[in-house]
Curated annotation (Swiss-Prot):
EC id: 1.1.1.23
Entry binding sites for Zn(2+): Q256, H259, D358, H417
Role noted for this protein: Catalyzes the sequential NAD-dependent oxidations of L-histidinol to L-histidinaldehyde and then to L-histidine.
Catalyzed reaction equations: L-histidinol + 2 NAD(+) + H2O = L-histidine + 2 NADH + 3 H(+)
Protein's name in the database: Histidinol dehydrogenase
Cofactor: Zn(2+)
NCBIfam families (UniProt xref): hisD
Record-annotated active site: E324, H325
One Pfam family in the UniProt entry: Histidinol_dh
Record: residues binding substrate: S234, Q256, H259, H325, D358, E412, H417
A GO BP entry: L-histidine biosynthetic process
GO cellular component: cytoplasm; cytosol
Length: 429
């Protein structure tokens, strides 16, 4: 893991290169995704069967998982896993319940009622990865906010495996309250949810993480359906001063590096000795990490330790990165919170590691990546509702403001707009 001592501009330039390397997308992949979407849109279930056999090596006659299979899943998982899942659900629900908003009714002016109605989406699709690892936690994080929002129908898709879907995924789906589950994955699953097939219902919104093909497919169908965000590779930035614990920091960097080779892990510190210790500790921990091959490739390609002269400079650099995950391993992390402008989720102190947020604390782990934390937010209840404004004026209230409306409409050359107001009061002249 390279240690870099640079001025702010040079450091930022190198970080941008790291991020660009992590987000390189080959044109051939984009073309392949578009072709898959076109094929599924036209061929529907037949196309899904073709791609499921091609990419997953499984022949599927029926994509839907039976209620019996879902309910039996709990019999094949550990009790300790179910207990952990229930604890996570409790925390996710208690946190996201506080995000719920109510419709607005404004009756302050005589004869005028204005307001905003908040309504849940009718149905959503949740993509749950099933590639190099299984992610039951993603089920809870994507489904529970939708349930709290009042979404009527939640459809889940996840790639098939030889031998069936991981029962841990099914147990999480059952606990979270998923309505229908289908064994399809990849770009073809996103296309099926966006356009519908004979078996798969069309949804209004698609959420959930996935590989590059899934992310590009979501981008392609945006506008046909809504999506949560375009998720890039996982990333973490650790800001540390001399009080930082090298073992903890290295472990947290590797917790993101093990996701995939394109993940980014960066430490920004004010202390050279700590930087050297973190570098050694990363190598030491890689030796015993089960997913060390993936993590090592990630660290070698997209990992770095930056030395900066001050904590202020470290936070400034972090804000420019706008990371998905930001950890503050500093003396007074809460005092630094006001200086953090751009981050998906912030972890304060040595005992608030990123995996705590991934699994149990309650805030959502579906976060903006690739610098989009500058303008995107974590997944929330808000993502599963839509808002409609309403207006009610009495005759007298409209009459009192008609001249303003007519003036503005005429200035814009929209005379029918003006006429629609004037015609209501012509008989009085």
């Amino acid at each position: 893991m390279e240690i870099i001592y640079e001025e702010f501009k040079e450091a930022l330039s190198k970080i941008k290169v790291l991020r660009e390397n992590a987000n390189i997308i080959e044109e051939t992949v984009q073309r392949s995704v578009r072709e898959i979407i076109r094929h599924v849109r036209e061929g529907k279930d037949e196309a899904l069967s073709f791609y499921t056999k091609k990419f997953d090596g499984v022949e599927m006659k029926n994509f839907r998982v039976s209620e019996e299979e879902i309910q039996q899943a709990s019999m094949f998982v550990e009790n300790s896993f179910l207990e952990a899942l229930k604890e996570a659900k409790k925390n996710v629900v208690s946190y996201h319940e506080k995000q719920k908003k109510h419709s607005i009714f404004d009756c302050e002016s005589k004869g005028i009622i204005r307001g905003q109605l908040i309504r849940p989406l009718e149905n959503i699709g949740v993509y749950v990865p099933g590639g190099t690892a299984s992610y039951p936690s993603s089920v809870l994080m994507n489904v529970l906010p939708a349930k709290l929002a009042g979404v009527k129908k939640i459809v889940m898709v996840t790639p098939p495996r030889k031998g069936g879907i991981d029962p841990h995924i099914l147990a999480a789906a059952d606990l979270a309250g998923v309505d229908e589950i289908y064994t399809i994955g990849g770009a073809q699953a996103i296309a099926a949810l966006a356009y519908g097939t004979e078996s798969i219902p069309k949804v209004d919104k698609i959420v959930g993480p996935g590989n590059l093909y899934v992310a590009l497919a979501k981008r392609e169908v945006y506008g046909i359906v809504n999506i949560d965000m375009i998720a890039g590779p996982s990333e973490i930035v650790v800001v540390a001063d001399e009080t930082g614990n090298a073992k903890y920091i290295a472990a947290d960097l590797l917790s993101q590096a093990e996701h995939d080779e394109r993940a980014t892990a960066i430490c920004i510190t004010t202390n050279m000795e700590l930087a050297k210790e973190v570098e050694k500790e990363v190598e030491r921990q890689l030796e015993t990490l089960p997913r060390s091959e993936i993590a090592r490739e990630s660290i070698n390609r997209n990992g770095a330790i930056f030395i900066v002269p001050s904590l202020e400079e470290a936070l400034k650099l972090s804000n420019e990165i706008a990371p998905e995950h930001l950890e503050l391993h500093i003396k007074e992390p809460m005092n630094a919170l006001d200086y953090v402008k751009h981050a998906g989720s912030i972890f304060l102190g040595p005992y608030s590691p990123e995996p705590l947020g991934d699994y149990l604390a309650g805030p959502n782990h579906v976060l903006p990546t690739s610098g989009t934390a500058r303008f995107f937010s974590p997944l929330s209840v808000d993502d599963f509702v839509k808002k409609s404004s309403f207006i009610s004026y009495t005759e007298e209230a409209l009459k009192n403001v008609q001249h303003h409306i007519v003036e503005l409409a005429n200035k814009e050359g929209l005379h029918a707009h003006a006429r629609a107001i004037q015609i209501r009061f012509e008989e009085e002249k």
